[in-house]
Regions:
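Catalytic-pocket segment enriched in acidic/His residues
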Residues: 2-131
Length: 131
C-alpha cells in the first residue's frame, strides 16, 4: 500500500509506504519451519475480484537468504521483524490507464501455504493533515 502523492514529492519512497494502517500483515505469523521452500511460494493479488498480480517468490531479484544476509551486515534482525521485498508486476499506478485504489475497493492477497489477507480500502478522514 502506497500513498502516491507523498511518494512522488520526496527523494525516497519510504514515507509513502509508512502511513498508519498502510502495512497490513496477517492473517497470522508463520515461522520459517512452517513454510517449506521460501523460494517456491505463489503470490497473488486481487482488487475487487480482478487478478492484478500473479507471481512467485522464485521471481525475487535477490533470494530470501541473500536479503537477510545483506540486511544483517548493518542491522540486527529480531524475531518478529518484517522484511519487505517489494511487489510483483501489476501495480495499478503503472497500468495504462492507471488503476488507483479508491474507497470501497477490496484488496485480497494470497500466498500459498501462508494464507489470505483481505482488506477494504477506506477513505482518508476529512480532517487529516496534508502537506
Amino acid at each position: 500500500m502506497s500513498v502516491r502523492d507523498w511518494q512522488m514529492r520526496v527523494p525516497t519512497w519510504t514515507m509513502g509506504k509508512s502511513f498508519d494502517t498502510h502495512g497490513p500483515l496477517g492473517p497470522w505469523l508463520t515461522t520459517a519451519d512452517e513454510v517449506g521452500d521460501p523460494h517456491a511460494l505463489a503470490v497473488r493479488t486481487w482488487v475487487n475480484g480482478e487478478l492484478r498480480q500473479n507471481s512467485n517468490t522464485k521471481e525475487l531479484i535477490f533470494d530470501c537468504f541473500a536479503l537477510v544476509e545483506h540486511l544483517t551486515t548493518a542491522s540486527t534482525l529480531e524475531p518478529g521483524d518484517v522484511v519487505a521485498t517489494g511487489t510483483p508486476a501489476g501495480v495499478g499506478a503503472v497500468m495504462r490507464p492507471p488503476k488507483f485504489l479508491v474507497a470501497g475497493d477490496v484488496v485480497r492477497i494470497e500466498i500459498d501455504g501462508l494464507g489470505r489477507l483481505e482488506n477494504p480500502v477506506i477513505a482518508e478522514p476529512e480532517d487529516s493533515a496534508r502537506i
